[in-house]
């Protein structure tokens, strides 16, 4: 958390939408629980502005995006539609409107934000773009960084043949926000375009990071390098190895 006058700015680097260490073990929700607890800490510190770092996040589980979105939005829209998942005409019975979680489901972690700053890169995709597109129906979302990937569709995982060590994950549905908008096939163009690799790289959360620095400037009108703002608490960085794709198939290495 960074403090500038009455601005208490939360920052989260989120690199993959997974409910637990094994993305395909849906019974393990340890990551989701940790995320809820983290947002309770943000709320206890009176965070009223937020920077969400999705620059290296290529997507993941929609229900994890549902949780994150529900922790960020205004409290009075909890329970409203988040996104629409629409299948082809042969599977229209599977069409689903996914809601924002209810107040009781996000415990005490909802930040009740009026706006959100999202840091992006060229591999920001899928569930990350769902966050941007869906929250624009409820919040002022500012995008800082590079143009995103442009993945407006979702995939269904078929993992019945576990003994062979592979899964099938075809594209099966199109994703819209509640206003039926999904016009980002070419990715989201940033409101402020910045290529982080044109300057020295900094640690996540370091105010020398040009993307985070720009977000701080947008919020406060001050350059973070001209004024000291001390991050409160330890930064925690977790790594998920990249998944391999070939011809729209998700390839999972066998143990």
Q: How does the language model describe each region?
A:
Residues 55:
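Short strand-turn motif at the edge of the Rossmann-like AdoMet-binding core
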Residues 52:
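P-loop NTPase catalytic core of nucleic-acid-dependent motor ATPases
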Residues 9-12, 16-26, 36-37, 41-49, ...:
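C-terminal "post-core" interaction segments
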Residues 1-4:
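Long, low-complexity, repeat-rich, intrinsically disordered, solvent-exposed domains used
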């Amino acid at each position: 958390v960074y403090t500038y006058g009455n601005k208490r700015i939360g920052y989260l680097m989120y690199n993959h939408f997974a409910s637990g260490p094994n993305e395909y073990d849906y019974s393990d929700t340890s990551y989701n629980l940790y995320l809820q607890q983290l947002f309770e800490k943000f709320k206890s510190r009176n965070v009223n502005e937020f920077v969400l770092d999705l620059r290296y996040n290529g997507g993941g589980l929609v229900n994890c995006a549902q949780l994150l979105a529900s922790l960020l939005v205004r409290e009075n829209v909890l329970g409203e539609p988040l996104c629409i998942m629409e299948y082809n005409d042969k599977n229209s019975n599977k069409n689903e409107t996914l809601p924002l979680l209810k107040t009781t489901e996000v415990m005490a972690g909802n930040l009740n934000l009026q706006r959100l700053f999202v840091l992006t890169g060229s591999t920001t995709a899928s569930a990350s773009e769902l966050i941007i597109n869906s929250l624009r129906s409820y919040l002022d979302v500012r995008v800082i960084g590079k143009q995103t990937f442009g993945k407006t569709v979702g995939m269904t995982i078929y993992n019945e043949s576990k003994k062979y060590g592979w899964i099938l994950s075809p594209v099966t549905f199109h994703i819209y926000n509640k206003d039926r908008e999904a016009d980002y096939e070419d990715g989201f163009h940033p409101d402020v375009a910045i290529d982080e690799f044109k300057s020295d790289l900094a640690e996540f959360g370091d105010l020398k990071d040009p993307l985070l620095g720009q977000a701080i400037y947008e919020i406060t009108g001050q350059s973070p390098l001209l004024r000291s703002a001390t991050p409160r608490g330890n930064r925690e960085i977790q790594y998920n190895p990249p998944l391999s794709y070939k011809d729209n198939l998700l390839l999972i290495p066998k143990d």
